[in-house]
Amino acid sequence: MNNNIFSEITPDIIRLAAKSEAADIIDTELFTKYDVKRGLRDLNGKGVLAGLTHISDVRATEMIDGVSHPAHGRLFYRGYDVKDLVNGFTKDNRFGFEEVAYLLLFDELPNKKELEDFRALLSKYRSLPTGFVRDIIMKAPSQDMMNTLARSVLTLYSYDDRADDVSLPNVLRQCLQLISLFPMLSIYGYQAYCHYHDGKSLFIHRPDPDLSMSENILHILRPDSQYTPLEAKLLDIALVLHMEHGGGNNSSFTTHVVTSSLTDTYSVIAAAIGSLKGPRHGGANIKVVKMFEEMKQEVHDWTDAQEVSTYLKKLLHKEAFDHAGLIYGVGHAIYSKSDPRAVIFKSFVEKLSVEKHLEKEFALYSLVENLAPKIIAEERQMYKGVSINVDFYSGFVYQMLGLPMELYTPIFAIARIVGWSAHRMEELANNGKIIRPAYRPISEDLSYVEMEKRR
């Protein structure tokens, strides 16, 4: 029973909510009648064309004899295949976050000098205003880390003398500062909550200017600041793979929409955070981890394909886990035959599972990866291919890295703010109109009713 009066849902509120719902329901046939693209997607799930972008390209089909066919997914950042980018920096034993961020923001791969200068600039910006941790982050810590992150971002507005300046140089400066600060805002917020609500010891580590983004995340998160090279490498790859995914995903489109009003950078990024927080967007890997935790309890032999298949069918029949009828981490709005991010991720995930002595868990994930698409196709009579998506393995990776579940979505935000920044810059550079789609009214015109005549 919640005794917080602020959060109380009274009988009056329940009554009024029912009244509101009854007034707001729209007959689903009307959406078809007026050819409304619900979710801005057509009947096949393809997004309507709402804009153009240089930043990235998500491909899942190929043309054969003039006909579009499903193909293995590919993801391009500024024209470069992400697979080639990851192979490039891992082969040379470099961290990729800063290099790929430079590419997304400036449309070219940096040379050695440009990369060194860019890393130095991000390091320079990796410092919060004096007293910010004490006065903002430590005060009234929230149980939700995405809300904490959004609040911190909005509060930074008051520390910026040029907060409302939307000139490109100023917006770039703001975006680079936020990219640099996101790990601190996220992790310090989590540590403050654990200290005040769970009584845990408080460790506040300053970022190390000589470390990469992924190394700094592990450095400031862990009490002893220790991590292995493989841990840092895999987190770096995870950040790169989550950095950008087209202008039509919900948070990037939110960035375009809010930017088009010419509001400030802090408001735009806070809006994008709010979008990413939603369970339909940024929280899928948490569902995957929780689903597997139950699976490991319910399935006695993790190597038995028949027993695992039986559990997966229970998921689809709404007889297991959250009874939603979903196998989390399988399927994607665009990709069908394969998600390139998951394909890239898998080989590195296996290496970390060996280092962490979690080979049996990895084998279970691999078995589900092989079984789930076939079972979904059979049970749902789907003719479009289905495969695992990047969320399938990312939660397992974060679990192996010892990242608290409360930080899974903020880690996503730490990566995706690079894409948001690139889309904000692109929207401003093209000086487009304010985004304002149409909504068709379907209510009847009514005559005003005097008070004494109302029912």
Predicted features and spans:
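Non-transmembrane, aqueous-exposed alpha-helical and coiled segments at domain scale
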Residues: 1-455
